[in-house]
Design a protein with these regions (language model features):
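Hydrophobic/aromatic residues located in beta-strands of well-ordered beta-sheets
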Residues: 29-30, 78
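CheY-like receiver
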Residues: 40-41, 46-111
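Conserved acidic segment of CheY-like receiver
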Residues: 1-12, 16-17, 51
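A generic structural motif
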Residues: 23-29
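Cytosolic nucleotide-utilizing catalytic cores of signal-transduction proteins
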Residues: 10-11, 37-38, 59
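Conserved Asp/Asn-Gly motif in the active-site loop of CheY-like receiver
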Residues: 30-37
Length: 111
């Protein structure tokens, strides 16, 4: 499965890239993005089957990005990473069709 990793913190992106054995789980990381704008460009070039995405990012949130995906009929499954425990984030993620919701900090094994 094709995976896109989106997080505004480059250390999180690099950690996810290098500390998780994606191939063993059947994933190929096709791209990474540090914001929603770059993620959109990546998705327009090549739609990922799964997107691992931070919710709180500058300019546009991960929730905005998922809404953009759904408006275009894209079926990418979204797993949100967030440090925010507020129920409204989880509720909105589910309303938009989010696949899962992981609280940070999370061990790489949990991801």
């Amino acid at each position: 499965m094709k995976l896109l990793i989106v997080d505004d913190q480059s250390t999180v992106v690099q950690g996810l890239l290098h500390c998780t054995n994606w191939a063993a789980m059947g994933f190929t990381v096709v791209d990474t993005a540090l914001n929603a704008v770059d993620a959109k460009a990546s998705l327009l070039r090549q739609e990922a089957e799964v997107m691992l995405c931070d919710i709180e990012m500058p300019m546009e949130s991960g929730l905005d990005l998922l809404d953009w995906l759904r408006q275009r009929g894209m079926t990418t499954r979204c797993i949100f990473l967030t440090a925010h425990a507020e129920f409204r984030y989880a509720q909105e993620a589910l309303r938009l069709g989010g696949f899962d919701y992981i609280m940070q900090p999370a061990p790489y094994e949990q991801v």
